[in-house]
């Protein structure tokens, strides 16, 4: 309810918003509260709607900002570390070396394919790999594929490394829901345009329909794209930037260590970030330190004893751990940063989101599918072309 009301207020104020909903229910209530004059600003992204899939390409970058290539490679590797970190022995230094060089080889020449599908192809298809090498202008990457990968034997041989990398891509590429989304050459919406022009991006990542790992991958990609778009705003004077508000529920599942960059850097580019989660043990130590070391405003509803003890220093001396453990339903404690100055903590009552106009929700979804989606048969045909010899 709290997040919903904040998002609805931003939308009603005419601001740009992105919301990642891991449940799929909150976005329905938000859609019902879109003002009439903002209906055309809405982009509703539901990857489980397969008739007209929308593209989301992590490897896509703006050629006017060549530094984005390095960001894409680093962020993609961080994403796969996040997804497969439970099995660290499969992602050692050799895996990283091949992974980074395969990704760099692909993005050096977008014209010959620039998706996650093509990273997998460049590992398995020698003809395609040779084409990429011929067109690659990065001498370090070319040297790796010719002098190191091409001559390595034993455990370091290309044939031995390939399954370790492609198996991690194939989980998504073989999935009938995911493939038409992540294998499109161009994302269906431009994140910089969304931020600059006050668009409303509502992302439905319902795990029940997508599965955990698929939902997490898409969420991680969107967070990376938002960060990349925010950092590219360095070319615009601050007084000309429109503020943009980014909301993430269950953020621990869709953030890498780059969240520290969002918290410390992106505020310069008028990106406001609001993150919600259920308990602190969900968060990796590195991300936890980045979050609590950078956030300006903290709000807590009733929580358990361990989390209450952890947060007590944030709310003392006004509230104790015992107070935090006994907050009434629909109430919270809040500590804000106002004009760079911390306020004293205070308690606050929250209210349900307004009912809005539920009758407009399905029409708004269909509008997004028509404007931003592509016919599935067309998408699958374009993908199939890449496998024709």
What are these regions (language model features)?
Residues 22, 276-282:
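Conserved H-loop
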